[in-house]
Amino acid sequence: MSVEIKGIPEVLNKLESVYGKQAMQAKSDRALNKASEFFIKTLKKEFESFKDTGASIEEMTKSKPYTKVGSQERAVLIEWVGPMNRKNIIHLNEHGYTRDGKKYTPRGFGVIAKTLAASERKYREIIKKELVR
């Protein structure tokens, strides 16, 4: 018996036809939730290194899995929601800023990108493990 895989969309369509769309979505949502919990936990640990009031850590949340507009991809959004409005400062902290012609790099400069890159392998392993279950 031989297997020929032509592309991911075809494989997904075949799996959906065997197991059903709702079952596949529930399985992928479970995998996304588990992997995003790992990422949030890792990100919160990294944010501890430059914590001031702790508001950025407290307001860090994740959305429920949703379907991206214009594609069939499922995703989870990491966002900062709360009374301290940390969402306004996260961008400045991640990318730095310029004031009076001088570039400033805060203590938390690039921490989200670094954490994302460092945890990518483990994130994918969690997704694979959950999808195989």
What do the predicted segments below correspond to?
Residues 1-77, 84, 95-133:
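Short, Lys/Arg-rich flexible segments
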